[in-house]
């Protein structure tokens, strides 16, 4: 018993001293603290907003959820709000700036048993999304074979270590960046939609 405890302590100390080797991969092979893609995007919700000032979350796919304002935490709140892009002259050139909707959302949204879909899941979205978090920043990179551009969403909060006043400002930022990957000029229209709720 004592010997196995000492061995565990020694292994723990090695992991602390050499985190790059001891903690670089988990049992499924995803890199520790690396990028999230495919099924690893399904349950990510990165909080954005000032400390104690309400929040919304940037999901792994780029969707907005968990909108909690005015001291009312509401982690199931998914408003009718999304960014979209249209590329002129491209077939299938209009898409929501999000990755594919996770399967668990399609078959289990809140109150779906009451016949309330209240979702925008049927709109076309980008095929691939890659999420990476480096607090207080999170990025979602979007790609699609139909689109002659790549999109990047960067979400961040006003977090300044040792500065509680400025870190608690009621601010959350989403930046959208587009890169033309076609090699020729394209005409693009971007919009951010907020639709009324029922």
Which functions belong to the PLM regions below?
Residues 1-4:
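Positively charged n-region of N-terminal signal peptides that target proteins for export
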Residues 7-16:
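Bacterial N-terminal signal peptides
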Residues 19-24:
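Boundary at the C-terminal end of the N-terminal hydrophobic targeting segment
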Residues 25-106:
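Beta-strand-rich N-terminal accessory domains
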Residues 106-171:
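Extended, loop-rich substrate-binding clefts of extracytoplasmic carbohydrate-active enzymes
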Residues 177-182:
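Asparagine-centered strand-capping/turn motif at beta-strand->loop junctions
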Residues 186-190:
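Short, hydrophobic/aromatic beta-strand segments
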Residues 191-197:
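Conserved small/polar residues in nucleotide/adenosyl-binding loops
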């Amino acid at each position: 018993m004592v010997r196995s405890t000492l061995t565990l302590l020694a292994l723990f100390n090695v992991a602390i001293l050499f985190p790059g080797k001891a903690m670089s991969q988990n049992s499924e092979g995803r890199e520790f603290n690396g990028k999230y893609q495919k099924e690893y995007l399904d349950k990510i919700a990165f909080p954005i907003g000032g400390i104690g000032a309400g929040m919304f979350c940037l999901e792994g796919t780029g969707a907005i959820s968990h909108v909690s304002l005015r001291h009312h935490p509401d982690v199931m709140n998914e408003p009718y709000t999304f960014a979209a892009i249209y590329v002129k002259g491209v077939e299938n050139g209009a898409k929501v700036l999000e990755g594919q909707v996770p399967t668990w959302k399609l078959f289990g949204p809140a109150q779906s048993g009451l016949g309330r879909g209240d979702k925008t899941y049927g709109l076309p979205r980008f095929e691939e999304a890659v999420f990476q978090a480096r607090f207080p920043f999170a990025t979602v990179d979007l790609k699609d074979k139909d689109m002659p551009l790549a999109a990047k969403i960067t979400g961040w909060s006003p977090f300044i270590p040792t500065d509680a006043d400025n870190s608690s400002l009621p601010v959350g930022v989403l930046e959208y960046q587009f890169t033309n990957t076609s090699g020729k000029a394209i005409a693009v229209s971007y919009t951010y939609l907020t639709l009324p709720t029922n």
